[in-house]
Amino acid sequence: MPQIKAPISVSGSDAAWSKNGAGTTILCTSDHIASPDDGTYISNSGGDAIRVKIDPPDHPNKTTGLKMKCRCSGSGIGQEIALRLFQGSTGIADYGSISIAPGSFEDYEQEISEGEAASITDYSDLYLEVQSSTTDQLDVSVLELEAADRILRVYVTT
C-alpha cells in the first residue's frame, strides 16, 4: 500500500499565486496525479516559485525510484518549468528546462538520481518547488514526490 502524504505548510508566501476553483487553497488535498481534478489549480504569471513542505514520510529505505511529479499547463510557446527538491533550505535536486505544452494540463516527471536521493538525511524536512522560466501563466494542479513503493504527495490544489 503506498504511503500518501499531503502538504502541511507553504514555505514563504503564496500571495503571488491565484487559487482557481471551488475551495482551492495551496494546502488542500487532491486526487492522485493519475486521476486529477484539473478544475482546481493554482496559477502564476510572474515567474514566481511556489515551495511546499510535505508531511513527514517514513524513510523509503532505498535511493532508486524517487521521482518529482507535476501536473501543469503553460500559456506560452517554449515555456519551461523547473522542479526542485529541498531538504530544509538545502537544494537536493534541481531540474530546470523541462518543456511544457501550452493550453492543456499534462503530467511531467523527473527521476531523482541515486546520488541526490542518498544525500537526503531527514525525510521530515522535504520541500517541493515548481517555477516557470518565463512570465507566461503557469497553472499547477498537482505536485508530488513518489517513491518506488511509497508515494509521498504534495498537492497544491483540490
Where are these regions (language model features)?
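Extracellular beta-rich ligand/substrate-recognition surface
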Residues: 33-50, 135
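A short beta-strand element within beta-rich, extracytoplasmic domains
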Residues: 48-75, 128
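Edge beta-strands of jelly-roll/beta-sandwich modules across compartments, strongly enriched
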Residues: 136-145
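Short glycine/proline/serine/threonine-rich loop/turn segments at secondary-structure transition edges
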Residues: 61-62, 116-125
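Enriched but not universal
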Residues: 1-11, 17-19, 148-158
